[in-house]
Amino acid sequence: MYGPVILPGHMKGNPHSWLKKVIEGEEPPHQKIPNDSTSMSHLHDLASLFLAAYENPKASGRYYGVYESWHWKDIYAELQKIFPRMKMPEPITEPAVEPTGFDFSRRDSLGVQMRDIPTMLRETVEWIKSLPFKSD
């Protein structure tokens, strides 16, 4: 889950904890890029999906609450655009697995415009950099 968190303790979870470390100049969590994918969603987008489903009397059943799934090599490539000096994990040497695929037709029927992954990453990093829980 990307985007702002509600409580300071939430900063200890993924992805906020390791993004904060990268902001502070530490290494990312992987020594080698995982040959795997992860599904990503922004907190505000997920909340908007919940509200849209709740307010739609025709909505029923399950809806995917993620934007999409990206391979870790693509996530790290995007993070390198944000953090040009970040030490990159070792690249994968085998063929990359396909990211998890979804049929988003039900999700999209709710009419919620979701942030793409580059925007999600950038906004989350900017939010963490703002030191939201800094006490004076």
How should each PLM-predicted stretch be described?
Residues M1-S17:
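Flexible, glycine-rich beta-alpha linker
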Residues P4-P8, D74, V97-F104:
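Short, solvent-exposed polar/charged micro-motifs at secondary-structure junctions
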Residues N14-N35, P84-K87, I92-V97:
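Alpha-helical membrane-targeting segments
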Residues K20-Y63:
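Alpha-helical substrate-binding/gating segment
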Residues H42-L46, H71, D116-I117:
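An acidic site on a long C-lobe helix of protein kinase domains
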Residues A47-A96, T124, I128, P132-D136:
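Mid/C-terminal beta-alpha module of Rossmann-like enzyme folds, strongest
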Residues T93-Q113:
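Conserved C-terminal active-site "lid" loop/helix of NAD(P)H-dependent oxidoreductases
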